[in-house]
Amino acid sequence: AVSVLVLPASAASLNNSAIQTAITLGAMDTSQTGSLDAAVTRGAFAKMLVSFSAYRESASQQGNLGTLYKDVPGSSQWAPYVRIAVQQGWMNGYTDGTFRPDNTVTLEEACTAALKLLGYKMTDLNGVFPTAQLNKAQELGLRNQLNRSQSEAMNYEDCALLLYNTLTANTASGSAYGTSLGFTVSNGQVDTSTVMLKSLKGPFVAAEGTQLPFTPVSIYRNDKVSASAELNRYDVYYYSESLQTVWIYTRKAAGRILSLIHISEPTRRSYIS
């Protein structure tokens, strides 16, 4: 038997490829897809940056490494992501020894971090901050369809779009950034399915009392975002532990995953035959 696992779009807000990709990479979870207009904090943006980088799978393995900034203790949910973002030079703390993880991230801060993610040196840009950074981001297409102005706070949808545009943009060395992460980039679109297949496990048929080996962040049930990862008897499920995602299908026969596809219409369904 052959099956095709769909990366679902269960509502209008999820029809955007940027949102789907952010969820797939772990930059966002199902709780945030319900409030896409919520402002993104510096701590949350550090996580999003790392999720769109080569460090996305190793960040959660760092554990408690001690206090990074006086307002980011090692026990903070943002600590591993802030550590990586700062060590890689994508974000900076403040001279008073704080990171201010709860401050909202602005357009110019987010664009600057994205440019650094792409390997651009701020000293090579023409002009002064933030005009130089915003102009370079515009030139590279990072601000495509991003309706924010200087000093405006970024919400989750904005950040997902900015980082999706980063995947399709050229790095300082001239290659599409997404390809360096193993994605296929074509005509401004990013296909993450090849990466997902490497970490995908299943299909499995749930028995009475079956438990997942991890607590998923993103849950899809019958191609719709769900808040519950409860497995019922005979549910067919797939999961990616590294992406902290599970796909559950009720009353469907098991098959073998051969490919994953992205769709944008909420009425499309995956099939298993």
Q: Which sequence ranges carry the predicted segments?
A:
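Single conserved hydrophobic/aromatic residue that forms the stacking wall/gate
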Residues: 261-272
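Histidine- and acidic-residue-rich, metal-dependent catalytic cores
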Residues: 85
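Structured, solvent-exposed acidic/aromatic patches
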Residues: 153-157, 162-164
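Short nucleic-acid-contacting surface segments enriched for D/E, G, S/T with interspersed K/R
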Residues: 224-237
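Feature responds to low-complexity, polar/acidic, surface-exposed segments characteristic
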Residues: 1-18, 23-46, 50-79, 88-108, ...
